[in-house]
């Protein structure tokens, strides 16, 4: 009796040449190696709210000199996502700030329009700072929200200071996702 389950592993690349080398070695989406299965390609698109490195569309309310940090240009993210997507990989991304969320939503929309695949389950991890217009776009793309409730307690103390009361009110609005029919799961960074 084999008691081990298959580990579905997200894989992360920073540049297209890294992913291309991986593909050149023959690794494909859903390939297995024993109990190891290649899952989605993961993009780390921004940082964290408390450090002011989550990428925001507007300057931080309590630090007007910064909007955080996008870790990809639009074209870098598109090129990497396109290479992963056209080779059968689902796309998933760490996005906390609304600029990172918008960038990834734009990228997924562009790639999935150019290369439609009904079987893809693309998703975004965190989904924290997002107004209702972005939430609506998220739903229309049928993305999975990998929410992390563990951060609510710490972030609730700083969210309004960081993004202002109006955007803070619309953020972490996972009840609205549920009402809209967004597929969600709660998890922690341990599995990422």
Predicted regions: what is each one?
Residues 83, 106-114:
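Conserved helix-loop functional segments at active or binding sites
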Residues 118-122, 126, 155-166, 185:
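Short beta-alpha connecting loops at secondary-structure transitions
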Residues 1-98, 102, 137-144, 149-150:
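Metal-coordinating catalytic core of metallo-dependent amide/deamination hydrolases
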Residues 2-3, 31, 111-119:
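Short helix-capping segments at alpha-helix termini
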Residues 131-136, 176:
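Short gly/Ser/Thr-rich phosphate-binding loop of adenylate-forming enzymes
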Residues 56-61, 143-177:
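Flexible glycine/proline-rich, aromatic-decorated loop/lid segments
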Residues 25-26, 109-112, 142, 162-165:
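Short, hinge-like loop/turn segments at secondary-structure boundaries
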Residues 190-192:
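Conserved small/polar residues in nucleotide/adenosyl-binding loops
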